[in-house]
Amino acid sequence: DLAPMPDLGSYMSIEAWDPQWEEPALRAANRLNESEWGRPPLTQEQWMQGRTAFAPEWSFVAVDRTGDRPRVAGFLLASRYEQDWAALGWCEGYIDQLGVLSAWRETRVADALILASMWAQKRDGMDRSGTGVGSANHTGVLAVYDSLGFRTVGQTRLYAIEV
């Protein structure tokens, strides 16, 4: 069984993905990419690329309303890769991106985003929820996934050579 949603307090909410959150979520993603990985910011076009399997009904934002304007504290983008289900032997929702800004890392925002997506996937008949996390990820998200019951079912190595 899935864990219940954590209490985030009265000023933090987990909200369904909506086009109004695209730009604030992109800004949050760019802050994370720069601070965590030293990557240049994504353009709107780059942010939208590769979303052929995007499932907005399984995607969420964490919104902090402690100030005079709502701020995105975190986001989760999920997908449905239906072409993989026969090979997997089950129906799976997939968490493609999860980001929580550093000011909210010590809260349960990551847990709440993941659980919101898992509950939505379960409601839609998915058997499992999956994700991929790089071994170099130092944000502590591996412990969050572990605490929610995710288990390593496979590993991938990427190889490259300059040509």
Task: Place the predicted regions along the sequence by residue.
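A short, internal acetyl-CoA/4′-phosphopantetheine-binding micro-motif in the GNAT/acyltransferase core
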Residues: 98-105, 135
